[in-house]
Amino acid sequence: MKKARETDGSMEPPKSPSRLTLRGLDWLNFLLADVRTGVGPFLAIYLAGYKWDEERVGLALTVGGIAGILTQTPAGALVDFLRSKRALVAVGVAALAAGALLIALFPSFWPLMGAQVLIGGTSSIFIPAICAMSLGIVGHAAFDTRQGRNQTFNSAGNVAAAVLMGLLGYLVSNRSIFFFVVALAVPTILILLLIKPAEIDYQLARGANDGEKGGKAESVWVLFRDRPLVIFLTCAVMFHFANAAMLPLLGELLAKGQGRSSMLFMSACVVTTQFVITLLSSWSGRKAGTWGRKPLLLIAFGVLPIRGILYTLTSNTELLVAIQVLDGIGAGIFGVVSVLVIADLTRGTGRFKLTLGAITTAVGIGASLSQVIAGGIVHRVGSHAGFLFLAAVASAAFAILYFLMPETRNLRLAKE
């Protein structure tokens, strides 16, 4: 592990990917966001129209989430192992479309549970596969900027999907959203053809150094004995534990006395967050290469407790929506910089996507626990107590990051 980090970035030859491949990556991020967004957020409303009660809707959503958590680490390992990243993404998109079609045609219990397992399981492929292709195409030197650009197009796709599919549900039917996802899978798969496989360096794509052709990947257990990686894992889990329940709690707050308009305000919250993420993502990628990773992470972690406290200070709907700007700042920075930190810490190990998948699994578990624990606090004590509890966890995460986490941008150059 130490030796890998001492490898000078100058040993990696400069990458010169074609414009067509880079545009293909851009639009793949945009379209994948559309496909993935179309299945999740509208499912509860769709099932309610078929007289599903809250318990069964909650079970359906939980099954998909559990499938995603359980497959994150295997998906990362699979991406590291397979050379054909494009084919893997294509299979994932096709499987997701099949799940959406199953939901649209058979909105009964068992078919829908099967569809949720299929969708949750295959969705785990996309993030590590996109990161792998990006790293293999542009190399470590340009990965900061590329990851920021990926997140920008992903967030723009999320905004477009939220608006377009909301209009489809309003003007046509909720069911039409899932048919649209199926149709959207076709251009998403076709856009993969723009990405030239010859421009994806397999060794770089799995996090090895250039020139280590056929090198053996380090054991994942060795990686997780690495102190900075364990510290970052702890911080990431706490960040998502503090963050995951805030928007659902806000939704309950907005629903009080708002009637049907509560859905409109919730949509405004989502669009506000994604718009800020879109603006910040490219900036975060650029600044991560000059400022370093830690200063940006401190900003992301710092706004989270402030956001939790602000929710307790007002009941004004417009102000509550405006506070979502802080959500966009935190998510926009963390979404870009967290991947860069993992790339820094696993460089030369050949375990980039496996580690990314393992951390995403842990983060998913933390987010799930957030919903349960914060929900219990709100039920017994009230929403203000729930927000303050989450703010306290976020403050603890900030303290651990500030005092214990090293800067990772040049960590591989240090003589340890």
Sequence positions of predicted segments:
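Cytoplasmic helix-loop-helix junction between adjacent transmembrane helices
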Residues: 117-154, 341
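Structural signature of the two symmetry-related core transmembrane helices
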Residues: 87-101, 182, 295-309
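C-terminal membrane-cytosol helix-exit motif in multi-pass small-molecule transporters
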Residues: 183-205, 397-405
